Swiss-Prot record:
InterPro entries xrefs: Ribosome_maturation_RimP, RimP_C, RimP_C_sf, RimP_N, RimP_N_sf
Function description: Required for maturation of 30S ribosomal subunits.
One cellular component term from this protein's GO annotations in UniProt: cytosol
Record keyword Methyltransferase present: no
Natural source organism: Streptococcus agalactiae serotype V (strain ATCC BAA-611 / 2603 V/R)
Family: Belongs to the RimP family.
Listed name of the protein: Ribosome maturation factor RimP
Alphabetical keyword list: Cytoplasm, Ribosome biogenesis
Localization terms from the record: Cytoplasm
UniProt KW Cytoplasm keyword: yes
Disulfide bond annotation, renumbered to this chain: none
Upper classification of the organism: Bacteria, Bacillati, Bacillota, Bacilli, Lactobacillales
TM stretches of this protein: none
Length: 159
């Protein structure tokens, strides 16, 4: 059986050239939800995507997935082409650069001062270090996070 990450890598490689501007491939996820496998292809464009956009992109992507040989999928799956939503993943250095000034959530591979998850305003990102302003109980603090220690980053909703 092929690992889920390998399936994501194969699908990303196949569909990326087919996603044309103004659309951007944000993420590919493959996971079991309930009893079904779901392949989620998250797409965005400036101003957001419409239902018509997702239908059009499904028509582009679906036939491409059928051409992958050998078939990497262990079982039937549901294809979902959708918007990344409000808590969009930030998977690349470019995505983080574009998120400067935004409220984000960052999970780390190893803790900084006994903290592995930071949520706050991304003040800057120079390609190597993220600087985040966050609340520690009742005080604002600033932390510098080396990019290579970031396990996951996403936009977050500030409540």
């Amino acid at each position: 059986m092929i690992a889920n990450q390998t399936i994501v890598d194969i699908v990303t490689q196949v569909v990326t050239p087919a996603i044309q501007a103004p659309f951007e491939l944000v993420d590919v996820e493959y996971e079991k939800m309930g009893g079904d496998y779901v392949l989620s292809i998250l797409i965005d464009k400036p101003g957001g995507i419409t239902v018509e956009d997702t239908a059009q992109l499904t028509d582009v992507v679906s036939p491409l997935l059928d051409t992958i040989q050998p078939d990497p999928f262990p079982e039937q799956y549901m294809l979902e082409v959708s918007s990344p939503g409000l808590e969009r993943p930030l998977k690349t250095a470019e995505a983080l650069s574009n998120a400067v000034g935004s409220y984000i959530n960052v999970s780390l591979y190893k803790s900084i001062d006994k903290v592995k998850i930071f949520e706050g305003d991304l003040l800057s990102f120079d390609g190597e270090t993220l600087t985040i302003d966050y609340m520690d109980k009742t005080r604002h603090k600033t932390v510098d996070i080396p990019y290579q220690t970031v396990a996951k980053a996403r936009l977050a909703v500030k409540l």
